[in-house]
Amino acid sequence: MAAFTSTTTAAAASPTPCRPAALVARSSAAPLRSAAPVVVAAGLRRAAAPSRRGATLRVQAKKQTFSSFDELLEKSEKPVLVDFYATWCGPCQYMVPILQEVSEKLGDKIQVVKIDTEKYTSIANRYQIEALPTFIIFKNGKPCHRFEGALPANQLIQQIESALEVAK
């Protein structure tokens, strides 16, 4: 999993997905399960760490390992927001602090999971990920809402809340 330390200062007023030719050209006939266990970062938390200038915020991600993506969705007691990303994707890196903020604001309403599309290509193919970042909200193990592109925190929260309201 990518570390939660990279940040960018680019701002996006509207969704700006990356569409790499390699992802678009990928065959959808790939196997549905990856051979390696799925490792995700979930339950983003902020912790105070002392410094000379006062407290510094440090993000801690709770890493969990599942034998399959389906197991992760099946065992989740709350809706799951999956961020399909790549380490080379600028808008994906822009979303790192935004996802942290959203996770903090929504608390126990939703579980945030990040899936590296380069590492887990079979999962990306299964959900036909062609643009990055792509977000899919799963409720009861099934996708209920999907959107693409980098969004400010307030718009991301609106997307999540409206999807959860419709899915009730």
UniProtKB/Swiss-Prot annotation:
Domain Thioredoxin: 59-165
Compartment list: Plastid, Chloroplast
Main localization of the protein described in the UniProt heading: plastid
InterPro entries: Thioredoxin, Thioredoxin-like_sf, Thioredoxin_CS, Thioredoxin_domain
GO molecular function, one term: protein-disulfide reductase activity
UniProt protein name: Thioredoxin Y, chloroplastic
Site features described as Deprotonates C-terminal active site Cys, chain residue numbers: D83
Assigned GO CC terms: chloroplast; cytoplasm
Organelle targeting peptide span: 1-58
Residue stretches in coiled coil: none
Residue numbers marked as site, Contributes to redox potential value: G90, P91
CDD domains listed in its UniProt record: TRX_family
Keyword Ion transport attached: no
Family: Belongs to the thioredoxin family. Plant Y-type subfamily.
Active-site residues from the entry: C89 (nucleophile), C92 (nucleophile)
SS bonds (residue pairs): C89-C92
Keyword Glycosyltransferase included in the entry's annotation: no
UniProt keywords, alphabetically: Chloroplast, Disulfide bond, Electron transport, Plastid, Redox-active center, Transit peptide, Transport
Source organism of the structure: Oryza sativa subsp. japonica
